[in-house]
Amino acid sequence: MPDASDSTPPRPDAAAAPVPIARADAASRSQRLLRMTGHGARAAVSTAAASKTAGCRSLPRYTLGEEIANSITHGIGAALGVAALVVMIVKAATAGSHPASLASAIVFGIALILEYLASTLYHAIAPKAAKRVFRIIDHSCIYVLIAGTYTPFCLITLGDHGGVALCIAQWVLAVVGILFEAFMRERQPRWLTVAIYLAMGWLVVFKLPQLVSLLDPMALALLVIGGVLYTVGTVFYVLKKVRYMHTVFHVFVLAGSVFQALAVILYVI
C-alpha cells in the first residue's frame, strides 16, 4: 500500500511551459503591430506632405556654378537699380520737371530693385522651403517690374492721351498676377505665366501711335530694343534645363532693363 506521503500532486511543468512561449508570441505580435503602425504613420505624413505640393512645379536643379552666375547677374541688376533710382530722383527733383516725374521715378526705381533683389535671393538661397517662397516672390515681382516700367511712360509721356487709364490697367493686371502666383503656388503651367508677362509687356501697342508721336525717336528705339531683349530672353527661360541657359536669360532681362531705364532717364523724366 503506497505511503500517503508519496501522494503529492503532479508538477504543473508540462502545463506551464507554453505560457512563456505564448507571452513571447504576443510580444512579438505587438512589436510587429507597432512597426506596422509606425510605417503607416510615416506613410501618412509623407502622403500629406506630398499632397501639399501636388501639382507644384519642382525646383530647377541648377548646379552650384549656375546658381552663382544667376545670383551675380541679377545682383548686378539690383545694384544698377539703386543707382537708377538715385539718378531719377535727382533729375525729377530739378525745377521744371513734370509733376508726375518724382512719383514715376520712385515707382520705377523701386520696381527695378525689388525684382532684381528677389531674383538674387531666390538663386542664392539653398534651403528648398525658403527657395520655393522666394521663387513665388521673384515671379510676383516681375509683374511689379512690368507695371513699374510702364508708369513713367503712362503718367508723363501719355499723361493727357489715355496714359493714366493704361497705367491703372497695368497695375490691376500686376495685382491679379501677384494674387495668381500666391494662391496657385505655381500649379499653373509655365507657358501661362510667360504668356501673362508678354501680354502685359506688349499692351502698349494700343497706345503705340500716340507714343510714337510724343516720344523722342531715340527714346522709342531704346524702349523697343528693351522689349525685344525681354522677349528673346523668354526663349532661354524655356530652355532652363540646359546648363547656363537661365543665366543667359538673366543677361537678356538685365540688358532689357538697362535699355528701358536709359530711355526713362534720358528722355522721359
Residue ranges and their predicted role:
Residues 2-269:
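Multi-pass alpha-helical transmembrane bundles in non-GPCR membrane proteins
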